[in-house]
Structures are given as structure tokens and as C-alpha cells.
Amino acid sequence: MIENWHRGFVLHRREYSETSLLVDFFTEEHGRITLLAKGARRPHSPLKAVLQPFTPLLLRWSGKGDLKTLTKAEPASLTLPMQTLALYSGFYVNEVLARVLENQTAYPELFQHYLQCMTRLATQPEQIEPILRTFEFQMLKALGYGVNFSICAATGDPVSPSMTYQFRENQGFIASLLQNNYTFLGKDLLAFEQLDFSDKATLQAAKRFTRMALKPYLGSQPLKSRELFQNILPNKLKSG
């Protein structure tokens, strides 16, 4: 890497003054970091066109306080070509990361997973759901969410594909005779462990689990990207 340059992506932008922006970036070496982009709202600012989501960037910043100033931003390559549902899925991933990542805590492995996720969304739009579920599981692991999908938390026995297990937060999966929103088939748990979402029922179960697991991190405020996605999906299906 070029000295003093940092690889990163825009997660979120918001107005700071009449001429400037506060920008949340996800960077390889510093994780999520918020930078002041002075003058970025001016019509002829070189930053205006550069600070866009899904564009791999090279960044420089300065400052010693909590809020540092962006001094340079250049595209490292072309913006990833997101289309409709993939675009909203990318916004969803960005919004979740902006909420759950601790400020200036490095997640180098998750950064690589993010890059892979964005690339796959751009090139494999027919696989949006498996791509999102894979990244959500990778993100939970990076956050330290240590659930063992292959072992019963109560007995230590291996998970049986044919049995039902109930999810208990901060504990794991326990064999259960009940069937409700918190229970999962053993075969699905074993697929979660391998990030194998090729089965439609497993894919649906994975979405149910990640919503449960992410809820403590996301809080009660609804995700704006999810609302947008839900609004655009019916129109997309009608037009298709």
C-alpha cells in the first residue's frame, strides 16, 4: 500500500455545514472512522463526485482529535455497478456496518469480506439473498458473536440434522420439542456452520436467525434501507 494512504469505502454521508460533509468510512486498517470532508458540498469540489458508496477509495486524513479531517480521496478503481435490488442490498449492508462497528476498531478480515460481498452483489445479482446471509454471518463472527452451530449448548453433543433446537441468546442452541420462531432444524444449523445456503428452507431460516442475532446491535430504530427495499420490491416484481 502507498504510504499514508488507506483503503476504504463510504458507508454514510450527512451534511455538516453549508459546504461540508461528515462521512463514515469503512477502512481496512482503522475500521469505521468518521471524517470531516471540508467543502465537499460545493458544486465544483473534487470530493463531490468521489465520495460515493461502492467506490473503492484511497484516503488520507489529518488531525489529532476524535474528528479528523479528510485531506485527500481518490478512487482506487471504478465504482461497482450495482443495479436496483443489488443497489438497495448494498445500502443495507452499509447501514448495518455504520451502526454496529465500533469507531476506529480494525476489522481487516471483515473488510475483505465486505469487498467480496460488494463485488458479488455487482456481478451475481441473482444470488442476493445468499450473498447477504453469508456476509451477515461473517459480520457476526467479526463482532465476537460466538455461537456454535454444530454443538448442543446444553449437553455438548453434536447437533443432529433431524432434531429441533431452540436458540437462546448468550447461550446457543439447545435441543427442544417445541417449534416456534426461535427453533431451527439441526440440518439448517449445520448448513449455517458451513455458510451453505443452497437450500431454500435453510436460506429462509438463516434470515430469521440473523435478524434475531443482529437485533441487540441494531437497536429499536428501523433500518431505512430495509424500508426502501420493501417499498421497491413490489414495484420491481410488478415490472418484471
Swiss-Prot record:
Keyword Transferase on entry: no
Gene3D superfamilies of this UniProt entry? Answer: Nucleic acid-binding proteins (2.40.50.140), Recombination protein O, C-terminal domain (1.20.1440.120)
Annotated Gene Ontology cellular components are: bacterial nucleoid
Keyword line: DNA damage, DNA recombination, DNA repair
Source domain of life: Bacteria
Record's keyword annotation contains Hydrolase: no
Which GO terms are recorded in the biological process aspect for this UniProt protein? DNA recombination; double-strand break repair
Family according to the record: Belongs to the RecO family.
Record HAMAP family: RecO
Could you identify this protein by its name?
DNA repair protein RecO
Lineage runs: Bacteria, Pseudomonadati, Pseudomonadota, Gammaproteobacteria, Pasteurellales
Q: Which gene encodes it?
A: recO
